[in-house]
């Protein structure tokens, strides 16, 4: 059942069903209140009598194990109740992971590392959120690694990132992204530089696995790893590489039997490969919608949101003070490479970038590396700025930055293909 609901009404949900709604119109606002019973949004429990607000772009699925009554008011493009939901299978996956965690705790071993894989638009990041929320609700402190450089659930697009999850996600805003570990990649698809992507994933896996050992509670909690939706050809090779790099204990495959069978064949026999259905509420996103989503994440990085607004700074930097580089030189045949080097080494080479008008709107990554002699690929990110103006006459650029001028001493900036049109009034 689909309906155009622009008024207040109550929805009565039976056990193991969910209310799904979408908001597509700008400036639309929907308020949801749990009246009676128990309900959750992607693993986060709703508090009775508390009003939750959702805005444009929201795709919501409120699930109940025992039945509930929800009061909903506002303008929605789609709203219906579904009894066809994979949530029972998802909580069974949580129960299996929790069994692994208990065993790891008893033996003082690392907890389970699970990769969430599948094609685009099957609900991978949603399943990650559900499993992470269930884990912290039983006292765990798992790590969340996001290898999806196209959308970015933790950082902005063009990066891989990891955060420690200590409390359930906010119903309205998701997880608190405090002190993330972020590594620069600089592209929105791994295929733009396959060699660099694998190197960045390997470094993130190495550092993340080591960090598990720093805290006993986190050690046994393990890691939930979100992956890209590119699952064929080189994309599939990236999934296998990630499984090896993270020493995955399990791989949860969403909605693609062929991928499931390929992984059963290609991963070690001690890795549990599980095929799971996607939710019927998952919506396929167009290229335009993906682009808008990337832009929105960058906008929130600089300007925050209506609940927590940020006020970024804009300042001029002369070309001569801009230490700007790009990772990945143009490909050369092996015969043209210096002795002892291979063509793929060029893909990880740090090369200087000369400022030109083409820099306009590009995101620049501020690295903690101070010199190109440092391990730039393996050095985490301090933050981001955006080029809002290039003045060739003045030999300068204007940067949008979360921090005021000047740039830190010895600031090393890395070019990214990610762009942001700063139209903020």
UniProtKB/Swiss-Prot annotation:
The keyword Magnesium does not apply. One of its GO terms (biological process) is mRNA 3'-end processing. ATP binds at residues 18, 59, 121-126. GO terms for cellular component: mRNA cleavage factor complex; tRNA-intron endonuclease complex. It holds the Pfam family CLP1_P. It is found in: Nucleus. The keyword Nucleotide-binding applies. Keywords: ATP-binding, mRNA processing, Nucleotide-binding, Nucleus. One of its GO terms (molecular function) is ATP binding. InterPro entries: Clp1, Clp1/Grc3, Clp1_C, Clp1_C_sf, Clp1_N, Clp1_N_sf, CLP1_P, P-loop_NTPase. Transmembrane segments: none annotated. SUPFAM superfamilies: P-loop containing nucleoside triphosphate hydrolases. Belongs to the Clp1 family. Clp1 subfamily. Required for endonucleolytic cleavage during polyadenylation-dependent pre-mRNA 3'-end formation. This is Protein CLP1 homolog. The lineage of its organism: Eukaryota, Metazoa, Ecdysozoa, Arthropoda, Hexapoda.
């Amino acid at each position: 059942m689909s309906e155009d609901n622009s008024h207040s009404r109550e929805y009565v949900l039976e056990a193991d069903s969910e209310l799904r709604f979408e908001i597509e119109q700008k400036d639309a606002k929907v308020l949801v209140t749990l009246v009676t019973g128990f309900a959750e949004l992607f693993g986060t429990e709703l508090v009775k009598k508390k009003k939750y607000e959702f805005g444009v772009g929201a795709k919501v699925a409120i699930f109940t194990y025992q039945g509930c009554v929800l009061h909903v008011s506002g303008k929605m493009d789609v709203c219906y109740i579904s009894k066809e939901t994979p949530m029972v299978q998802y909580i069974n996956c949580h129960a299996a992971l929790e069994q692994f965690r208990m065993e790891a705790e008893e033996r003082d071993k690392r907890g389970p590392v699970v990769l969430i894989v599948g094609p685009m638009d099957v609900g991978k990041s949603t399943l990650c959120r559900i499993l992470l929320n269930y884990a912290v609700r039983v006292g765990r402190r798992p790590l969340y690694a996001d290898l999806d450089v196209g959308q970015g659930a933790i950082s902005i697009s063009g990066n891989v990132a990891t955060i420690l999850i200590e409390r359930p996600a906010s119903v309205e805003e998701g997880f608190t992204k405090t002190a993330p570990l972020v590594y620069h990649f600089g592209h929105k698809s791994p295929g733009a530089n396959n060699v660099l992507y694998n190197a960045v994933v390997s470094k993130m896996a190495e550092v993340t696995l080591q960090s598990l050992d720093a805290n006993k509670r986190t050690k046994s909690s393990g890691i939930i790893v979100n992956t890209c939706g590119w699952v064929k050809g080189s994309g599939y090779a990236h999934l296998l590489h990630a499984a090896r790099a993270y020493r995955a204990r399990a791989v949860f495959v969403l909605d693609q039997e062929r991928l499931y069978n390929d992984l059963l064949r290609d991963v070690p026999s001690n890795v549990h490969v599980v095929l799971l259905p996607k939710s019927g509420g998952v919506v396929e996103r167009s290229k335009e919608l993906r682009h808008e989503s990337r832009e929105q994440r960058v906008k929130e990085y600089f300007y925050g949101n209506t609940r927590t607004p940020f006020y970024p700074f804009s300042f001029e930097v002369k070309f001569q003070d801009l230490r700007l580089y790009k990772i990945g030189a143009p490909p050369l045949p092996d015969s043209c490479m210096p002795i002892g080097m291979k063509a793929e080494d060029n893909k990880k080479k740090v090369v200087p970038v000369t400022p030109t008008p083409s820099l306009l709107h590009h995101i620049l990554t501020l690295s903690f590396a101070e010199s190109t002699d440092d391990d730039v690929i393996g050095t985490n990110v301090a933050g981001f700025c955006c080029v809002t103006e290039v003045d060739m006459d003045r030999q300068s650029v204007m940067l949008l930055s979360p921090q005021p001028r000047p740039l830190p001493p010895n600031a090393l900036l890395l070019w990214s293909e990610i762009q942001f049109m700063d139209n903020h009034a």
